[in-house]
Amino acid sequence: MKKNIFITSLLILLLLLSSCTGDTCIDPDDFGFITFNVSSRYNPGEITSRHEGDQVTPWRDSAYKVNGYPLTIMVRPWNYILGDKNTSGQLSAWCPWYGQKNNTTTLAPFCVKLQPCTFWDNARFDMCTPNPENRNDAMISNPPCIMTDGVGLYFLIAAKNTDPNISPDSQRRPQGITKHLGELTSSVGYEFYSISSTGQFLKAGGINYQYNGEDKSKYAQSPLYFKIIDKFYDDNSGQYRLVIKSGVSDTRPDPLQFLTDLIKKVLFGKDGMIKKTYQQIIDTPGYKISVSAILTLYIMFTVLSFLIGNINLTHVELIIRIFKISIISILLSTDKAWTFFHDYLFVFFIDGVQQILQIINEAAATGPGSQSLLGLLISTQTLSKLFSLLFVDWLGFIYIILYLIALYFIFFLIFKATIIYLTALITIGMIIIMGPIFICFMLFNITRSLFENWLRQLISYALQPIILFAGIAFISMIIRTEIYSTLGFGVCKHDFPNLGPINEIFGSFLEDIDPSLGNSIFYWWFPVPMKGGINNFHKAKILVPNDHIVVDASCKNDHDKCKHCAAYECIDERYIELPFLDLVKDSTRINNFINGKFVQLDGILLIFVSIYLLSKFNDTAVSTAQFIAGTSGNLTDIQKVNQQSYESLSQQINRPLNYVAQAVSAPVTSRISAGTEQASMFFAEKFENMMMERLEKQALSSSANKAVQNEVKRKYGIDSKDVKMNAIKDYEDGISGLLKNLPKRNELKVKELSQMKFIQLRDKISANKYDVQDYAALSKEQKTELDKLLKDANLRALASEANFTKDYQEAYKQAHQEMSGRGIGLFGKNIGVLRSWQEMEHRVNVKRKLKEEKRIGIGEKIYAGYTGIKRAALTKILGKDLRDAYEGNLTSAEWHDFEYNDPRLRTYSEKLKDDEKAREYEELRMHINKETIAVQADILSPEYLVKLEKAGRQSDVEYYQGLAQKQLIHDVHSRLFEEGEPVMMGDRFMREKATDSQMRDMIDNAHKKYAELIDVDRYTRRQEYYDIIHEKAKENLEQTYKELKDHFKSDNISIEEMPSLIAQKVKDTNTGSEIDKKITEEINNFNTDVKNYEYSTAVLNKIEDRKQAIMNEVNAQIDKINKYRASAKMEQYVKPILNEGRKLRTLEDHLKNMT
């Protein structure tokens, strides 16, 4: 019984709230607009005049202040012919003739049926502006008439600290910004639309004023005034009804803001408890004596310590001590103590927090309606639109129930956040009260920790509401967007039920009570249009009513450059019935509305996901603030305080709602989970990108993690000592210098060019400088010229070093992620013993998992073999066709049917075999990792294999090459069979289903994958790096060989002879005391070149072997496809990959070849 009473009371309360609006219809973008009426009549005492026909009246204060955002004001349309009434609740027009004293909010009877005024040449701009020099009458072409659409109405943004009504002159010429609301909006590319009382969309008057330059900050928080300007007011009648859509600070009371303001006033007001208590402590005689004694002792200890040489008073130390003495001295002054500490310290923790929260709330208000999320959700306009869904769709009732449940949870989450905020506020007050005691503790080292803890607590409790409401603001932006998208349509009141003649009896009586009631006390809200159909929806250029980002051609590739538009700032073509929905992005929802489906359940699902995230954030905000301020070990947990404050109330109200929640939540639980996962993935992706950027910077900084660097060296063969940390910048600078010599340098971007390989860069520069397709299209002379240009800029070497540095960054990121994936956290990455333990624990877990998977795989493999025998026997007995027809009943067909969720369309049996291969590779990978850890080097890298060969360890080389070959086969297969465009499908599909064109595409795709493999392989990518080393060493040795040959006139010089010949040549060509030093330098250079040549030659040959192995494996797959083609009697499509590799000669062979 109590449950029913509660639910009934809640629904009645919300229904009453939805009926509180005085409008007959609500616009699509109206979620609680500020409304203001401006009458064309004034009391006689308010009117002043210099002479007859030159009256001036005061400006009407709207009681609102502008906030710097686009000021959007709409004038309600009014048309008597279309059914609008001459009542204060509907009239939005005025007449300059025939008015009487009682026509403040209504038209004179004679004016009601007059036509709207028209003007010669549409010259609305030449009205009676607030300029005393303008004495011209409006150029009306059809007097007498009525003024509509804001004609004659002006707004004034008064300059700060000015009063436009202080004198008649200030009323005529006020200081500030004055604009006419009656201008034709079509001239600026957009229109205002509003629903009339009869339910029709009509064009309306208004203005969208956007500030220029410094005016935004100059006029922020300036008061807003309105006035209908005329030269003679005594015969005016009527009014304008205004809707302020954006641009003012909403001062309407918030459900919970009143409570916080009340407590703030009691605690921190002019005569608040905190100030009184603080002053009482300072006024206590005992306190003053104690502070004086402490200050005297501090000065004495300072002087004594300085005299005996116990402290060294530097300038900085002296200033600090004088500052401390000055601060404590202020505590002795009763009159100045509170003023000083409040204005220079405490204000940051009280008013500063409040200002930050206000900025956060304004940023979260991404559209019309209350800045408070709760205020938006329970506004009469929102609830009216919500309840309009009840009779237009059978899902409307479910949506309303879900909305109310969501509203319930949001209320308690925000209530919980408010309790945390108020508790923090009270705690800040208590900490401030103790300030006079703890501030004295900063004098001595033994008590300084008490002062620091006091200050740290003050910071912690100030941060808690900031972090908390920042999270709430972020989540509320998501909820707001969904509310605007799902309820962003117009609604109108309709008599419901229609009582016929009875309505007419009560009509006039009801209109006196509330003009919006119409003819019946029984009514309901219905959407406009009430039915779907494309003819009921109309496109137009309008002001977009919510914050959004404009993505156009100029920023399509870089969204950071896209323009961010505030609500009502930018113009776009949209349906006037659905102004929040973008024609492209929201096409699905628009189609639902056009088809008559007004209920959008996916929106309510996202709201529930946001509520879940908000609840999680509420639980972590306090601990986050404590962690930042270093007070996470506090004995006081503010969350427990707030939990106890509303726990009993929550339990009581939850009881009747639990049944409703369980009844309606079951069908949507799975979709909520999916939405939660999607939202979590979004945040995870953003966080991951941020972390990857941080790791890229960390890899090249002095703070790079040594354990990760060792992991990179061990697993990827890249030593951080070999990496030039500024290589990327040097490469960009080199490109920038080169571009200065190009004719069309403005067409090229340094950042884009720096991402290219050297060959691609050369092609790009060739096209820019010579207007050709690429480098190959150049003539011999042009190639020589360009090669010299590139060589002078040293771009090839710079590109190689930059690519090597990027590879190191990528390896650093991967190593960091791999270590984290193995359970090595922040401490493990810095503590060797802990890291070794975590590595061992990870290996044990992987082995246990592999063992379990292998055990399951063996059982499945046995059963798959058994079903395969049954299937083969069935094929022999019945034949293939009958087997396929009856297979599902006679054998376990699921083992041999296609897995349609598998990109390669393998059978389950084939998939088992591939899983077994994957387990074998995992064991191989663990074995390679074990070997790598043992030698602390990348055992598969060409560099390490060359070092082993030079050390004479040929057996180890062969063993490691065998491991490298196995891993390479797996890497090639992984690339060839990856999702998207696999080169090879399942065996059964290839035998029975694959077509000629599919197999040709597979072979063509294999060629593309081969190029990708060569490009991304971390070993083959180093070829350019060693090519440059090889070429430099080769060039130096050839030059040395040529000089020796010319000097000694001999063509038969061996490598072994060259050092002694170099020494002899230096003696023959040089004299002086530095000759020995010169000989040593020349021989060292020669030995370095020999070493670089031989080492780079060996590494490059190993890289070439790896490329050949990749090619062989890809060709093996191509051959396999061709065999399937031959079995299917298809024409041959043999297209093997050819490797245009090279084998480099030894140094001795190369020098012999020179002779």
UniProtKB/Swiss-Prot annotation:
User: Which Gene Ontology CC terms are recorded?
Assistant: plasma membrane
Q: Look up keyword Membrane and say if it applies.
A: yes
Q: Where is the lipid attached (N-palmitoyl cysteine)?
A: 20
Q: Write down the membrane topology.
A: Multi-pass membrane protein; Lipid-anchor
For this UniProt entry, which segments traverse the membrane? 289-309, 395-415, 424-444, 459-479
- GO biological process per UniProt: protein secretion by the type IV secretion system
Q: Which residues form the signal peptide?
A: 1-19
Q: Where is the lipid attached (S-diacylglycerol cysteine)?
A: 20
Q: Where in the cell is it found?
A: Cell membrane
Keywords, ordered alphabetically = Cell membrane, Lipoprotein, Membrane, Palmitate, Signal, Transmembrane, Transmembrane helix
Instruction: Name the domain of life.
Output: Bacteria
Family per record = Belongs to the TrbL/VirB6 family.
Name of the protein: Uncharacterized lipoprotein RP108
The species this protein was found in: Rickettsia prowazekii (strain Madrid E)
